[in-house]
Amino acid sequence: MPDATQHVEDLTPRQIVEELDKYIIGQDKAKKNVAIALRNRWRRQNAPEEMRDEIMPNNIIMIGPTGVGKTEIARRLARLARAPFIKVEASKFTEVGYVGRDVDSMIRDLTDIAVNMVETEHKEEVQDRAQELAEERILDILIPPEDDGQSRAGDGAHDGPGFQLHQTEETQVEEDQDRESLRERTRQKFRDKLQRGDLDDREIEIEVTSDSQSMMQMFGPMGMEEMGVNLEELFGNLGGGGQRKKRRVTVEEAREILTQEEAQKLIDQDQVKEDALERVQQAGIVFVDEIDKVASGTRTRDEGGQGAGVSRQGVQRDLLPIVEGSNVQTKHGMVQTDHILFIASGAFHASKPSDLIPELQGRFPIRVELNNLDEDDFYEILTKPKNALVKQYRALLKAEDVEIEFEKEGVSELARIAAQVNADVENIGARRLHTVLTTLLEDLLFDVPEEIPPGSEVTIDADMVRDRLSSIASSRDLSQYIL
C-alpha cells in the first residue's frame, strides 16, 4: 500500500502554494504556512527514526472573517495530500457530562472517513477481477447449468426403458464433451454480448446481501461507538455475514451491484483498517471551525454567564489532550493523535485568540491573519480559479446547449456590487458572490430552454448587471439578500 504522503513528496512548499493558487485567490501567508506544514510531514517521515516520533506538527490557527477562504484552504490542502480530512465546528461540542457530542467524536469520524478512503483505493486495485467475477455471476443467471443453451430434452427421445443399458461408455463420454463444448460456446456468445452492452436493458433477478446500516443507526445514540464496539462487524458475525435478498434489476445495474459485492469479498478488511489507522495517525487533518465561539467563555464567566463560561472552557480542556496527543478508542481500533494536523479558525469578532486557555494557545503555535476581500479580489475569484463561479454557470447552461459569455466589464460590475453590499450590510466575503450571481441569472436560468432555446447565445455585460442588480446596489434594506 502506498504511503499516505507519497502524492506530495515531490511537491515543494512553493509548488504546493501554486496548486492552491489554482482555487484560492490571495491569502498568501496562510497558503505559505499550510504548505510548510504539509511538507514537514514528508520531512518527518524521512527524518532519522529516533527523531521521528519527537517531531510534532505545527498546528495552525487562522484568524479572519467569514468567506475569506479559511475552510477552502484546508479542504484543498487535504485533497492535494490525499489525506483524511474532517471539518468540525467547535461550538457543536459539549463538555464531558453535558448532553451533546464529545470532542473524541471528531477522531472517530475522521477514522471512518479514512477507512472509506482506503477501502475505495483497495477496491480500485481489484476492480478488473471483480468485474470478471460479476460477469460470471450474471452469465450463471442468464444461462443456468440446467438451461445452458443445449436442451437436454434431446436426451428424452432415448429415455425409454433399458436404453441406458445399450449406451457404451465411449458414447457417454462423447456426449458429455459435446454438451460441455456447446455450453462453453453458448456462454462465450453471451459473454461477448454482455461486454458489448447488448444485454444491458434485459431484466434479471439477482441475490444481494442486505445492508445492515439501518440496524447500526438504531443503536448509534446508545454510545456503543464510544465504547469502541464495531456494530457492523458484530451483527455481521451473528447473522452469518448479512441476509440475502432477491432484487429484480437490469443487467447494467446488476453488473455494478455485483462488481461492488465481489470487490468487497476480494479486499482484506483487516489490511484496510490497518492502513486507514496508519493514514489517520500520520496524515490526518482536522479543521476546527468557530474556535472563537468557545474562546469567549473565558470572559462570559466573569460577566455573569458562569454556566456557559464553564461549559465553553470545558470544551477547550477536553480538546487539549487530543491536540496534545492522546489515544482515542474507535470501532476500528486505537488512534494516536500525536501527529494529526489541527487547523483551527475563527472570526474572533467578540473575542481574541488570547481568550483561549493558555495550554490550548500553546498547541497552536502558528497564527495567520487572513485579509478581507476587496473588489479586485472578487474579480479574480469570479474569473481565475479552475472552479470559478462564472465557469460553473457556463458549464450548467452548456448542458442546455446555451452559450453564456461574461464580458470583462460585466464581471467588474458584479465584483463592484458584491463589494458594495458587503460594505453596506454585513461582510460575508466571497459568499456574497453566490447571492449576487444567482440573482443576476435567476430569470435566465428559469427561461431556458422554453424562452431561450438550445443553440442560443447570451452575453452578460455591465448594463445588464446594473439593470438587474440596481435594486440591490441602491437599497439600504438588503436583508433579503443576506445569506
What is the meaning of each model-derived region?
Residues 1-483:
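Non-catalytic accessory segments flanking P-loop/AAA+ NTPase cores
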